[in-house]
Amino acid sequence: MVERSLSYLDNIKLDSLKGFGEKRYSNLKKSNLSSITDLIRFYPRKHIDRSKIKTINQIDQSDIEKEVTMIGTISNVSVFTTKSRLRITTLSIKDSTGLVKAKWFGPQYIESRFKEGEDVALSGKPEIKKTGSIEFKNPTIEKFADIDELSETGSLIPIYPKVDGVSSGVIRKAIKDALSIIETPKEEFEPGIEDMLSSEVVDRNSIFSRTESFKSIHFPKTIEEFQKARERLALDEFIYLRSIFENLKSEFKNKNKGPKYIFENSLIDTFVADLPFQLTESQTKAYKEILEDLKNDYPMKRLLQGDVGSGKTVVAAISIYAVINSGYQVALMAPTEVLAEQHLNSLNEFLKNSDVEINFLTSSVKDRSEVMNNISDGKPGLYIGTHALIQDKVFFSNLGLVIIDEQQRFGVDQRKKLISDSEITPDQLVMTATPIPRTTALSIYGDLEISSINELPPGRKPIISHLYSGLKKDNEKVFEKCSKHLDADSQIFVVCPYIEESESSDIQAAEKVFLEYSKKFTDYKVVLLHGKMSYEEKENIMRSMQEGSIDILVSTVVIEVGIDIPNASLMIIESAERFGLNQLHQLRGRVGRGEKQSECIFHITNKKSLSTISEEGVKRLEAISTLSDGFKLSEIDLEIRGEGKVTGKNQSGRSDLKIADLRFDYGLLIQSKEIYDDINSLNSSNRVFEEAKLLFPNYFQADGTT
């Protein structure tokens, strides 16, 4: 007899369970819950500890600022809309010892989900009024079909994410039924869930078995038991990811043949020695890692990440030189013409003493016939461009290396087109100035090798950062800083988050700031750049800024990552609390690229101070104003926002981790590698991969390939 596998349980649909009619089953399917496997992997978002539930008369001053849970019955539901159209819903909830009021602000439609006479669990921070009455604001509320249900669930009651039309109580009962099925012997099955880890691995690592984990994640007897279950299930997710990425790499290597290069190390050494500056240790390490990859029979897939101004382009130049000297073409694709031109200028400088021919192809280049002929004829050289490089009429016949700058700015299909035009799969180098936390890198770029440049070139002056409030005295300081930099013939960036002010926000709009600076600095050229302008207008303004004909550029967030204006020495970020930490760091990096001492001002919204913004906003501003290391800031960003928002579907193109948390589980991530190596040595990796395909379908094509 064997235990039931997750694949077997995935074939048992929820409409076969008692109490699941067509409507309820339909609601569950909308939340991607259709099988027993889906259901047992629908993890609680929290547990209510029955031992810590308070009656109303037990809530006192010592509970203020703590989360308190109480059980009661709804005695009244009311909705009130203020003159400013703010919707306030109030529930009166009573138990045998008293009554509390719970209020929700905004369109949460609490009144449509909760009725008088229903039993509920309420969790939140209580406020005790001068009259002695107790009030909760925006608390968590859960419905229980019957108070008696609580006596059957043990000390810790699981509370599940919201599913429209299905209560937490119904989900609890369904999961109990599912676990009961799993625990019941039947024909060829013994109790339990088949474990991808052997009992030896489980024992050696002192972790829960899979069956124990699924039982205890939902219905733990203690918090410690819940933690052990969570750790095992999080570990499994990391093992699945590792399996997927190892198979991605293996599949890519087996299916694709890379270019064959012939280059002498002495040739590269001479090129590096002739550079006008000495490379940092991490630059040297990065280019050597790339050259080692280029020697392999299979194509390279490598991410080159480095902080703002760390010198990624010169590392790319060394790779370009090696590939072109072996008789191949190199394509470098940038997201905008301004950035493409900047790469053209930088690489012209780095490669000026070589015989490398550099070609430029963008939509605005008028005579493109010669470049197009060079591409189709397979003429070795560097081809720098934008989306024009992947147009239908562009056919590379001898492409050895593809370099993609700021990969997240291109769609998956666009990136693939540049690579798939060749019979031999070109090597791929992706460059990004957005440092990725080591814990997040696995889930975003797990199928790429990673090179990191984590130090700045020597002699570069650090940018001085200031955090100013929006109060009058600090506003004057901002203008004083502007005058100082303008007197030194420097240029200034002023960045705002939005074009227009809305009725619901007092945020400074770009037009308003533009008028303010225009009136204040009448002897200087102040220009406005915003997202509603055409592509050509934005490109022309950025060129004018590069040429030095603009003194102050007031802009919404359309300043390109990587834009290089050495004469810009002051960055002012208005309403800085409205920006993400990574955005703030990238914007700061637009200055400090020349010899002048540069400064960055993080300016809080007008009339506001640190005490008036959110706790998360304060953490961001304190971090950015005291730290300059992009890698450290990326780790802090992960801690503040959480993995879901950092990796997100939009960034990674995948929805992945259900229970693992990259902020806190780095130890499990490391452990997953050790365990996966054990699995490989036992030739069990195929089984793990099959489970990964079942549980992480977004990583796979319709035919099951990665």
Show the residue positions of the predicted features.
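Helix-hairpin-helix
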Residues: 9-32
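Upstream accessory/linker segments immediately N-terminal to the RecA-like ATPase cores of bacterial MutS
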Residues: 80-89, 94-274
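ASCE P-loop NTPase motor cores of helicases and related translocases
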Residues: 232-383, 389, 517
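Conserved helicase motor
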Residues: 358-370, 386-392, 499, 527-538, ...
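Conserved motor-coupling elements within RecA-like helicase/translocase cores
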Residues: 364-383, 391-399, 535-551
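SF2 helicase catalytic motif II
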Residues: 389-430
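Conserved interdomain linker/interface between the two RecA-like ATPase lobes of SF2 helicase motors
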Residues: 447-511
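C-terminal helicase module of SF1/SF2 nucleic-acid helicases/translocases
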Residues: 473-491, 509-706
